[in-house]
Structures are given as structure tokens and as C-alpha cells.
A protein has these predicted regions:
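C-terminal boundary of histidine-terminating zinc-finger modules
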Residues: 348-358
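Conserved catalytic-core segment of NTP-binding enzymes
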Residues: 230, 234-237, 241-348
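Extreme N-terminal, non-catalytic leader segments
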Residues: 37-40, 52, 59, 66-129, ...
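Flexible beta-alpha connector loops of hexameric P-loop NTPases
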Residues: 64, 209-223, 269, 273-276
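Walker A/P-loop phosphate-binding motif and the immediately C-terminal alpha-helix
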Residues: 123-162, 281, 285
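Short edge beta-strands and adjacent turn/loop segments
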Residues: 30-57, 336
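Phosphate-binding loop that captures ATP/GTP phosphates
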Residues: 147-213, 218, 225, 232
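N-proximal, solvent-exposed amphipathic alpha-helical segments enriched in charged/polar residues
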Residues: 2-40
Length: 400
């Protein structure tokens, strides 16, 4: 019935409402909703001969889901009595329409997310990078300390399961303990705490489970994801104003698991000024887009070194942070200069924001203020979110 000539059925053509109802059975497996409610599909016309014309907008014209969606539309409509032919007029969404789709997809992800022990009013920030060596953990502990110093209760989750470093960088050596909480049958792990200024840090890390920090954790993907689930479900976090998650580098199992379990997370991307680091860091932003997470902004770490004579030297290049922020349509939250005291603070367990008034400490405090005072805008969907076509096909087959 999709050839050039409409077929004759003898039945009356369907109504717009009937066709729309059938279109609602067609799902976009990546966005997790039907193509009507996503604003992708609408009935253009229904002729007296039963020819049904559908207007279909994709996030981008070259979206690899086009073939599958076409087959799904045709199979749903062609079996309806009175339909003699189905035509599809393909188009592309505007920027505003893509933003609306992203908003709905994010809402769907939140509705479908499992319950965790993280309070619903807690702002969650995942500190991420495309690769290691950019100072992501240093940024995490200094931002956490800066937020706590002004009176906030801040959770710090060390999700870098293999490369845990948060306990040492915050000067916490106690192991995690589990105990029963009033009204809760199952014992829960209790975060280790450190008072900072007017506030409090609550810290959880696999480094607090092993015998000593030199112990290697030889865990594979499923075990990594399970560990993160336990940190979210089996830890008694209590009230938190912020939860900062020190992410492992890259875009692997832990990142995908956290995006699924905590879809209200805002991503903060750490990069150095070099172009090569910026090109790797953009993958973290792409992961956020594909997982419907918002990007709170970019932090450029190790931006420049200033000598005792006041001369500034861009040892790792310059401009990478702003370039990355511009490319992903986000904000540059700040630039942290190179100071030996930052590394020394990590070695001694005293974040520089607690011991110094120098440029690096001031940069971290300013970034924390930006985070506290800024509402993250809805991120525009930069393009099609479709992943590997085989994975998409598996999702479709499971639905059917």
C-alpha cells in the first residue's frame, strides 16, 4: 500500500484522531517516547480515497533511525481499515523544537529513574573529563570545600572506582562503616564526615573500603556499575545541599550507569587549555547530550603559570576552555592557574581553598559562587541522539 497508486479497501477513511492514536504507538527508542508526544509526527491530510499523509520531523535529516521509524509508521497505519496509502513528508526540527524534545526526554528519564538515597532537593554535579591528567579530582575536592566553607552540606562521591584519590585529597583515612538507622531495616553505610568552615563534607569512596590505598581493584564493568549503585542506594547520605561526583575519565560503564540512575545530574567538564585536551573533553559533553544530562559549564584547569615577577606563561597552551564552552553552547565557569600549592594540598589532605588566598584558591571560590548563583539552562539537542544502529534495533525488538 506504499506504492505509487492507492489500493481500494471499500472502508471509509480513518479520522485524524484514529491515525494519531496509531502514530502514538510508534516510539523513538533513544528518546523514550512516542513520536507524536515528542512533536515529531503529525497528520498532514487524509484524502477521501484513504491516502494518509504524515509530516515527520527528525532531529537531523540524516538520523539513522529514519528507516526504522518509516517502517514502524507504515506497519501501524497500513493495517488500519480505510487506509489505502501512506506518504511521509520528511523534515528537520528547528533549534527550539530540538530543545523542547530534549526537555521532554530529560523529564522521561527522570520519571523512569530508580529511587536512590540522594534527596530530591539536592543539586548533583558530576565533575567529568574526557581523559585523565587534567586535575579533575583536584577540582572536585576544592569545589566541595569551597561550597562547604560557606555553610553548605556537601556530599562527595568518588566514582573513580579504579583510580580513587578523594580520601587522601581530603585527609580522610577512616574506613566506611555500616549501621542500622532508625526506621530502616537494612543497615546502611555511613559517609565519613569532615567539618569545613560553617558546613560539612560527607565523603564516600572505594578507597574507604580497601585495606590501604595501594590496593588495586580489578573490577570489570558490571562490578563497577554495582559499586556505584550501592553508593547511591546503600549509603545513608542524609540531607545534602550538593552532591559532587568525581567521575572516572572517559565515557564508560560508570558514566552511563550514573546517567541512568541520576538523570537530574548537571555535568561540569574539566579540561586544560590545550586544543588536544579540549578535543577529548568534548566527548564528555557528547555523552551528556546522548544521556539527556545538562552541562553546567566548563572549567579550564592549569590555565597558566605566573612567576614571582608577575609574568604569565601558558605552559599547556591557551583558549581550550573557552573554545570547548563555545563549541558545546555552555559557559566557561572559570580558569584555575597553575600553582604548586594545589598539588601539595592534595598530597596533604588540605584543599587549597582552605589554606590559601592565592589566585588558584580565589579561582575555585569564584567558580563555586558561579555554580551557586547560576541556573543551568536547558541544553539544546545538538543533533541526533541515535547510537549504534544494532543497539537501537535491539531496543525496538524488545519493545515489540
Amino acid at each position: 500500500m506504499t506504492g505509487n497508486q492507492p489500493q481500494t479497501t471499500g472502508a471509509a477513511p480513518p479520522s485524524v484522531a484514529e491515525v494519531t492514536l496509531r502514530l502514538k504507538a510508534v516510539m523513538d527508542p533513544e528518546l523514550g517516547d512516542n513520536i507524536v508526544d515528542l512533536g515529531m509526527a503529525a497528520v498532514e491530510s487524509i484524502s477521501a480515497e484513504g491516502v494518509v499523509a504524515i509530516a515527520m520531523k527528525l532531529t537531523i535529516k540524516g538520523c539513522p533511525l529514519r528507516v526504522q521509524i518509516k517502517k514502524d509508521i507504515e506497519s501501524r497505519l497500513e493495517t488500519h481499515p480505510g487506509v489505502t496509502k501512506v506518504t511521509i513528508d520528511w523534515g528537520e526540527m528547528t533549534a527550539d523544537e530540538r530543545t523542547a524534545v530534549m526537555t521532554r526526554a530529560r523529564w522521561n528519564a527522570r520519571e523512569q529513574a530508580p529511587d536512590t538515597q540522594i534527596p530530591l532537593n539536592t543539586r548533583i554535579l558530576a565533575i567529568a573529563s574526557g581523559k585523565g591528567g587534567v586535575g579533575k579530582s583536584s577540582v572536585t575536592v576544592n569545589l566541595a570545600a569551597a561550597l562547604a566553607s560557606v555553610g553548605h552540606t556537601v556530599g562527595v562521591l568518588d566514582a573513580d572506582i579504579w583510580g580513587f584519590s578523594i580520601p587522601r585529597m581530603l585527609g580522610i583515612s577512616d574506613r566506611l562503616e555500616a549501621r542500622r538507622i532508625d526506621g530502616i531495616e537494612k543497615p546502611r553505610m555511613i559517609p565519613n564526615e569532615r567539618a569545613v568552615g560553617k558546613g560539612l563534607l560527607k565523603v564516600v569512596s572505594t578507597g574507604m573500603l580497601v585495606e590501604d590505598e595501594s590496593t588495586a581493584l580489578m573490577w570489570r564493568g558490571l562490578m563497577l556499575t554495582k559499586a556505584v549503585e550501592q553508593f547511591l542506594n546503600d549509603v545513608h547520605w542524609g540531607e545534602l545541599d550538593y552532591l559532587l561526583i568525581d567521575m572516572p575519565p572517559g565515557t564508560g560503564d560508570v558514566q552511563m550507569g550514573l546517567a541512568r540512575m541520576l538523570p537530574r545530574t548537571d555535568l561540569v567538564i574539566v579540561t586544560t587549555p590545550s586544543v588536544s585536551a579540549q578535543k577529548v573533553a568534548i566527548r564528555a559533553a557528547d555523552m551528556a547530550r546522548r544521556s539527556f544530562l545538562r552541562v553546567a559549564g566548563v572549567i579550564e584547569n592549569m590555565s597558566a603559570f605566573t612567576c614571582e615577577h608577575g609574568e604569565s606563561y601558558p605552559l599547556f597552551g591557551e583558549g581550550g576552555g573557552q573554545t570547548l564552552a563555545d563549541e558545546i553552547g555552555s559557559a566557561l565557569l572559570g580558569q584555575v592557574p597553575i600553582e604548586a600549592a594545589v598539588a601539595n594540598g592534595g598530597d596533604t589532605g588540605e584543599p587549597i581553598v582552605l589554606t590559601s588566598t592565592g589566585p588558584a584558591a580565589q579561582a575555585f571560590l569564584a567558580i563555586a559562587a558561579n555554580i551557586m548563583n547560576t541556573t543551568v539552562p536547558v541544553t539544546e539537542m545538538g543533533g541526533c541522539t541515535a547510537r549504534d544502529p544494532e543497539a537501537v534495533q535491539v531496543a525496538i525488538s524488545k519493545r515489540n
